[in-house]
Amino acid sequence: MPVSVQTVLDDRIAQYVNRIKAQHHATEAAVVRELIEAGYEETVRQRHARYQRGECTFRAVAAQLGLSVRELYYLFEQKGLPV
């Protein structure tokens, strides 16, 4: 389910967004969405690494990401991350 957010960015992130927006002829929303998605991907990979090292359970990772166990399994599978 899509979520709409409004936020204020600090200067360095705003400068980055404006630079990318100009270079790629993209909207601010598209650039910010890409940044958020990249951050989420990194979070998923970090949680996966912790799971692989035995620092937390699969169920705990699912809870941290707000997913069911089945959804997390599917997400890891989609990203080619071993379960």
What are these regions (language model features)?
Residues E42-L65:
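Short, positively charged interaction helices/loops
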Residues T27-H48:
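Short, basic amphipathic alpha-helical segments that act as recognition/interaction helices
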Residues R33, A63-V83:
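Charged, low-complexity intrinsically disordered terminal regions and linker tails
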Residues D10-A30:
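Surface-exposed, Lys/Arg-rich phosphate-binding patches that contact polyanionic backbones
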Residues M1-D11, P82-V83:
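Short Lys/Arg-rich basic patches
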Residues N18, A22, E37, Y74-E77:
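Residue-level detection of the helix-turn-helix DNA-binding "recognition helix"
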Residues H25, E55-C56, G80-L81:
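Residue-level recognition of short, well-ordered coil/turn positions
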Residues Y16, V31, C56-A60:
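A general alpha-helix detector
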